[in-house]
Amino acid sequence: MVGRALQHRTVLKDRLASDRPRKLLAIDGGGIRGVLSLMVLAEIERLLIEQSGRPDYRLADYFDYVAGTSTGGIIAAGVATGMSVDQILAFYLQNGAKMFEKQSILRRLKSEYKSEPLAQQLKQVFGEATTLGAPELETLLLLVMRNATTDSPWPISNNPFAKYNDRAHPACNLDLPLWQLVRASTAAPTYFPPEVISCGDKPFIFVDGGVTMYNNPAFQMFLMATVDQYWIGAPPEQRGWTTGTDKMLIVSVGTGTSAGENYSLTPDQMHLLFNASEIPSALMYAALNEQDLLCRVFGECIEGPLLDREIGAMKGSRGPLNQKLFRYARYNAELTKQGLAALGCGDVDPASVQKMDSIAAIDDLQRIGKAVAAQRVRREHFNFEVFRP
């Protein structure tokens, strides 16, 4: 059965009609490093259970909008359908090796891993017939992918008021299979084959959302929650959620980052093959940090690691509007030797946990995630008195 039993389920329509403060959750892409994110989410869930007094309390009971890219899309879809963090973690622990099953030698010219094992597991978890607009989704859900056919980012949500979610539209996005959208968001080029999805009578080729600007989907989620054009089907006075530091909380969870520092690099080493391998990751790293920066510029940062040595963590920063639009917390780990040492994980080899397919490092990734949660996640970040469920 997909989703929670009806008596425990939050009805999305009722949630959208509420005037309570809004809580938004975003999870980065990063392959198997999603396990790190889940340890942070487990601590958040524990604090919410503690405050609510309900052992069966889930992240879907608290968060109104959940966004994810790539592996973050798997986690976000799990949260939106009412899964506990333990249930989502079990998916990774039980299926991690299957998700990264090698292609035959000849097929590795197209992609390193098979798509079928992951697709099959996604069908089992989310249901083959469950669509983006299914009632099993208790929150708004944003999944990020790239439409390779049209050369455009595709941030797609189940917002019933979005332009292409009109049930009268012949290619209504709400009718698309949830498992297939999640699979498309995880179709990392060179790692996995692309996913072909038919929208109405048109087939489109999709790849991982990590190759867009939104591998960290936090600020894009904020825009889709507040900009009126993303709510075009709603009555004018209901197009977008109200902003304010006591009216909106955005929580962003990373999968670990590491700058590709190389102080021994010489100009002669920067040949065609070097640039072909280094530029994509450099662009993704810059885009991920830009999303984080935008959230701190327009939001009141209550938690987050240093962005750089010039602007620091931007806690207490004024910003260009002279007022902040939301409260913001960013939890992430720096997967460098220094960063791991600061988390009490100095014995972990950085190279072993930096790769998105480091199946053998799952235990270390869990340990790192627990260390991040212990150091940085605080009960006051989720104060029920301010951001009531």
PLM-predicted stretches and their roles:
Residues 1-15, 21, 238-240, 260:
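Non-catalytic, mobile gating and regulatory segments of ester bond hydrolases
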Residues 233, 249-270, 294:
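Extended C-terminal subregions enriched in glycine
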Residues 32, 100-101, 136-230:
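Active-site gating loop/helix substructures
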Residues 116-140, 152-155:
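Active-site periphery "cap/insert" segments of enzyme catalytic domains
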Residues 2, 19, 211-214, 238-245, ...:
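C-terminal helical/tail subdomains of lipid-metabolizing enzymes
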Residues 48-61, 227-248, 302, 308-315:
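Short mixed-charge
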Residues 24-27, 60-70, 140-146, 205-207, ...:
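Extended hydrophobic secondary-structure segments that form protein cores and membrane-embedded regions
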Residues 9, 18-26, 32-125, 168:
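Patatin-like phospholipase
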